[in-house]
Swiss-Prot record:
<dbReference type="InterPro" id="IPR040739">
    <property type="entry name" value="RlmM_FDX"/>
</dbReference>
<dbReference type="GO" id="GO:0005737">
    <property type="term" value="C:cytoplasm"/>
</dbReference>
<comment type="function">
    <text>Catalyzes the 2'-O-methylation at nucleotide C2498 in 23S rRNA.</text>
</comment>
<dbReference type="Pfam" id="PF18125">
    <property type="entry name" value="RlmM_FDX"/>
</dbReference>
<keyword id="KW-0963">Cytoplasm</keyword>
<keyword id="KW-0808">Transferase</keyword>
<dbReference type="GO" id="GO:0032259">
    <property type="term" value="P:methylation"/>
</dbReference>
<keyword id="KW-0489">Methyltransferase</keyword>
<dbReference type="InterPro" id="IPR048646">
    <property type="entry name" value="RlmM_THUMP-like"/>
</dbReference>
<comment type="similarity">
    <text>Belongs to the class I-like SAM-binding methyltransferase superfamily. RNA methyltransferase RlmE family. RlmM subfamily.</text>
</comment>
<dbReference type="InterPro" id="IPR002877">
    <property type="entry name" value="RNA_MeTrfase_FtsJ_dom"/>
</dbReference>
<protein>
    <recommendedName>
        <fullName>Ribosomal RNA large subunit methyltransferase M</fullName>
        <ecNumber>2.1.1.186</ecNumber>
    </recommendedName>
</protein>
<feature type="binding site">
    <location>
        <position position="277"/>
    </location>
    <ligand>
        <name>S-adenosyl-L-methionine</name>
    </ligand>
</feature>
<feature type="binding site">
    <location>
        <position position="260"/>
    </location>
    <ligand>
        <name>S-adenosyl-L-methionine</name>
    </ligand>
</feature>
<dbReference type="Pfam" id="PF01728">
    <property type="entry name" value="FtsJ"/>
</dbReference>
<feature type="binding site">
    <location>
        <begin position="221"/>
        <end position="224"/>
    </location>
    <ligand>
        <name>S-adenosyl-L-methionine</name>
    </ligand>
</feature>
<dbReference type="InterPro" id="IPR029063">
    <property type="entry name" value="SAM-dependent_MTases_sf"/>
</dbReference>
Length: 366
């Protein structure tokens, strides 16, 4: 198996390919990307057979922006017989994988694959049983063992491979399944909820998404992102010249500042979260976020960067590198992650965590 399959949003295959080619080159691993527009996935074929496994071990999945999932695969299995689809799939894995912890039978995230997804759900049970009989898969799921992926790109055609559970997306098809809350002011609320799922480990939610924390939402109107903060019992400074949702204001947890988000300066030093979803040039938003972090006005930030029409990966990489250098020059130790989330469209979501000593929020300062 000398290929890497990367799932992505349809229409962003070129960005995904540019990114994996860049990351592989940094590891001195070389190959070429196979891209089909609007397919929802990219293949990166390594020149050296063992390099594919090395890549999915050494490239931190959390550092990939445009990939929803990353796995090693073999050659495409074509024209699987309806009488026996299982044997060829088992054959691809024998001698390659044993005692895996989970099976995922998946498809690209395209409209054309919706019917195929129904088949995958039915096919999973007999395939899982067969893999357990062959000792390719453990009897019980184990989150510490590799994941087997069977990736159908068309009826009877699939890639078979694996990912490592400590360096992959834990979500089926790389997509968190979130339900839109009926009382939220806008669908944008799902972007921030997904960002919490992707960027913050569940075992740290009680500390980092705790009730009583203070937050600022720049460009808050009508309140889609503020809603997520209020739902977690935070106190929110909502900054926007436009109107906020009355239901959010009625909670008593929101203070509305009718100010331009680029001009707002917090009057207290107890802000933990800064969130921002403003339609502006990526460089301008990146600079604003860097200023907040350098000034120590927040501890963590989640913000969106709108993507240009061309050279999206290059533009994103440039802005993130610029932020990294600015923080470093100011002696700020920070973790930076970025992801093209499922609920993002022509934008990416960035998370920055400033590493400094913890402090207790003081309600009297609100």
């Amino acid at each position: 198996m000398n290929k890497i399959a990367l799932y992505c949003r349809p229409g962003f295959e070129k960005e995904c390919a540019a990114e994996i080619t860049d990351k592989a080159g940094q590891k001195e691993i070389y190959g070429f990307a196979r891209v089909k527009d609007n397919s929802g996935y990219v293949l990166f074929e390594c020149y050296q057979h063992e390099d594919a496994d090395r890549l999915i071990r050494e490239i931190p999945f959390r550092e990939l922006i445009f990939a929803r999932q990353m796995l090693v695969v073999g050659e495409l299995l074509r024209d699987l017989s309806p009488e026996d689809r299982i044997s060829p799939i088992i054959g691809m894995l024998q001698g390659v994988m044993e005692r895996a912890g989970e099976l995922r039978v998946e498809v690209p995230d395209t409209n054309e694959s919706k019917e195929l997804l129904k088949f995958c759900r039915k096919f999973t049970v007999p395939l899982r049983n067969a893999m357990r009989q062959e000792k390719i898969l453990l009897i019980r799921e184990n989150a510490n063992r590799p994941v087997i992926h069977v990736f159908f790109i068309a009826p009877g055609c699939c890639y078979v491979g694996y990912s490592y559970s400590n360096n992959n997306s834990p979500f089926y098809m790389g997509i968190p399944r979130l339900k839109f809350p009926s009382d939220a002011p806008s669908r944008s609320t799902l972007k921030l909820e997904e960002a919490f799922h992707v960027f913050i480990p569940y075992d740290e939610w009680e500390e980092r998404l705790a009730s009583g924390l203070y937050a600022v939402d720049l460009g808050a109107c009508p309140g889609g992102w503020t809603y997520q903060l209020v739902k977690r019992s935070m106190m929110v400074h909502a900054v926007d010249n436009g109107p906020m949702s009355e239901s959010l204001m009625d909670t008593g947890q929101v203070k509305h500042h009718k100010v331009d988000g680029f001009k707002f300066v917090p009057s207290t030093k107890n802000i933990y979260w800064l969130v921002c979803d403003m339609v502006e040039k990526p460089a301008k938003v990146t600079q604003l976020m860097a200023d907040w972090l350098v000034n120590g006005w927040c501890r963590e930030a989640i913000f969106n960067l709108k993507l240009p029409m061309k050279k999206r990966y290059e533009e994103v990489a440039h802005n993130l590198q610029k932020m990294h250098l600015q923080l470093k020059e100011n002696g700020i130790n920070a973790q930076i992650q970025a992801k093209h989330l499922y609920h993002d469209r022509e934008e990416i979501t960035v998370h920055v965590r400033r590493i400094w000593s913890a402090y207790a929020a003081n309600r009297d300062d609100y």
